[in-house]
Regions:
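C-terminal outer-membrane/trafficking sorting elements
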Residues: 409-420, 424-491
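Compositionally biased, low-structure terminal segments
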Residues: 10-13, 24, 315, 360, ...
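Bacterial Sec-dependent N-terminal signal peptides
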Residues: 1-22
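Primarily marks secretory-pathway-exposed extracellular/lumenal segments that are disulfide-
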Residues: 5-6, 405-409
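Single-residue recognition of alpha-helix boundary sites
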Residues: 13-14, 285, 340, 433
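Conserved beta-strand/short-helix segments
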Residues: 20-404
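Prokaryotic Sec-type signal peptides and long signal-anchor helices
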Residues: 13-16, 241, 318, 417, ...
Length: 491
């Protein structure tokens, strides 16, 4: 009987990630500090326990100076790591863009900073020294007035950063450009020349993504190469001396698609491209296309992933933790109310992109999904910049973790212990497999709060009920110096 139950449990654990794909919120909402902060405009998770959140209109040190807050998960709640990272001066709007290659490094864009020229913009990189965020090197300033450098940033590692300045005029008015910098142990030094937009008004650099130090994808969402404002994306690789385009332009499908408004590369041979203005499924429903490199050309992987309804603007934000998983935001979707917003996760099943889970914004006008970040296939952060729970348009961010990663998390028992069913409606069977000396059973919730604790004498089987609402629970079984922990879903 025990072998059968164990086999059932193992088989269930194997098929569960394909079949259920449910996610539960990890901790409480992370609210913006004050009204009109628009916290959650940008989010980044370098791993499942760290998140950076931009509030580019925060007034903490000056009017609309902006700030970024980094949080760490302690097992039960999100705790701020260090102080706020504030912008330099009035109207800097620091935090519009950010990226974290690891949990101790962050690049932050302040696209209206006037350090070099008015609205030239700049980027600052910070390192965590164990107790505070310390700037690494000097500001990386934009080239000229109104460049808006720092509108987009991407860091594949702690010593490389790509910076988009979408209004730079080096190749024509508002053609835009991207610059890549590397750290030489003393300062940030440009790697290669500017990567300029193709023609005037392209706004190249509106989006940028680097999966590694030698590859970069650049979105120019107002390029007219395909047709008027269809947009395009170009991918470049470093040949040792210069940035060289890899393959042809990836053009948007139709006029006013704004393809390239969002891009993300999980690796050097995969790119996801958002076109929030695409009308394939309805006016401005939006779509996302994923492409792979076959050695010669960029080939679309599967068909278009279309927005659900008119004006959803699906594809406004994108995150790919790997080549077969994609999260995308539809910040104007009406799932729970007008412009409440949505985010969606899709998985490649070998032949098509399959919807795994959807996340609705909390309230009307939240614009949830304006930013998304997935550090892995089981965790997602979603920004809702107009949420007003802590003040009008203060914004908030929610983090969700997959409820499908169930089963044994830790054990040093020599014999097999089986807990079933999982998921459960509340009733649990615990088969210890052998008589154990005075086992103690402790149930805690996702926030580390103890829900139930029971002690037993010399038993090998028991039944108990999980009190409390549906959610994720942890069952700890102790007997002497032995311990095992199960992750259980209560439906």
């Amino acid at each position: 009987m025990n072998k059968i139950l164990t086999l059932i449990f193992v088989l269930f654990a194997l098929i569960m990630p394909i079949a259920a794909q449910s996610f539960l919120q990890m901790g409480l909402d992370i609210d913006g500090e004050a009204a009109e902060d628009e916290s959650g405009t940008s989010v980044c998770m370098p791993d499942g326990n760290t998140i950076a959140i931009g509030a580019y209109l925060n007034d903490g040190s000056s009017l609309n100076v902006g700030h970024v807050r980094i949080y760490s998960w302690n097992g039960s709640e999100w705790l701020q790591k260090g102080d706020d990272i504030d912008g330099e001066a009035d109207q800097d709007r620091l935090g519009w863009s950010l990226d974290m290659p690891d949990n101790n490094t962050i690049a932050i864009g302040a696209y209206l900073n006037d350090g070099s020229e008015i609205n030239s913009g700049h980027v600052r990189i910070y390192n965590w020294n164990g107790s505070a965020w310390i700037q690494k090197g000097a500001d990386i300033d934009g080239e000229a007035a109104d460049d808006r450098s720092g509108w987009s940033v991407s860091m594949p590692d702690a010593n490389t950063v790509a910076i988009g300045a979408y209004q730079n005029g080096g190749n024509g008015n508002d053609a835009g450009h991207v610059r890549i910098y590397v750290w030489n142990e003393v300062a940030w030094i440009q790697k290669g020349g500017d990567i300029d937009g193709e023609v005037a008004e392209d706004l190249s650099g509106h989006a940028v993504s680097m999966p590694d130090a030698n590859t970069v994808a650049i979105g120019a969402h107002r390029n007219d190469g395909g047709t008027y404002h269809a947009g395009h994306v170009r991918i470049y690789f470093w040949d040792g001396l210069n940035w060289v385009q890899k393959g042809a332009d990836i053009d948007g499908e139709a006029a006013d698609d704004y393809s390239g408004s969002a891009v993300n590369m999980p690796d050097a041979n995969t790119v996801a491209i958002g076109a929030w203005g695409n009308d394939g499924n309805d006016l401005n429903a939006g779509h996302v296309r994923v492409y792979t490199w076959d050695g010669v050309t960029w080939t679309q992987k599967g068909i278009d992933i279309d927005g659900e309804a008119a004006n959803d603007e699906f594809g406004y934000s994108i995150s790919m933790p790997d080549a077969n998983t994609i999260a995308t935001g539809a910040h104007r979707a009406d799932g729970t109310g007008l412009d409440a917003g949505q985010a969606h996760i899709y998985k490649w099943d070998g032949s098509a992109w399959m919807l795994l889970s959807s996340f609705d914004g909390e309230l009307v006008g939240d614009e949830s999904g304006c930013s998304v970040s997935m550090p892995n296939a089981n965790t997602i952060a979603i920004g809702a910049r107009y949420n007003s729970n802590s003040g009008y348009h203060a914004g908030h961010t929610r983090i969700y973790s997959s409820a499908d990663e169930v089963g044994v998390l830790e054990t040093n028992f020599s014999n097999t212990i089986v807990v079933y069913p999982n998921p459960t409606k509340g009733e649990l069977n615990i088969d210890l497999g052998a008589s154990n000396n005075n086992p103690t059973i402790t149930i805690t919730n996702l926030w580390g709060q103890q829900i139930l604790k029971t002690k037993h004498n010399d038993i090998n089987y028991l039944q108990l009920t999980i009190p409390g609402p549906a959610g994720i629970y942890f069952i700890e079984i102790r007997s002497g110096d032995k311990k095992t922990i199960f992750k259980i879903i209560k439906e």
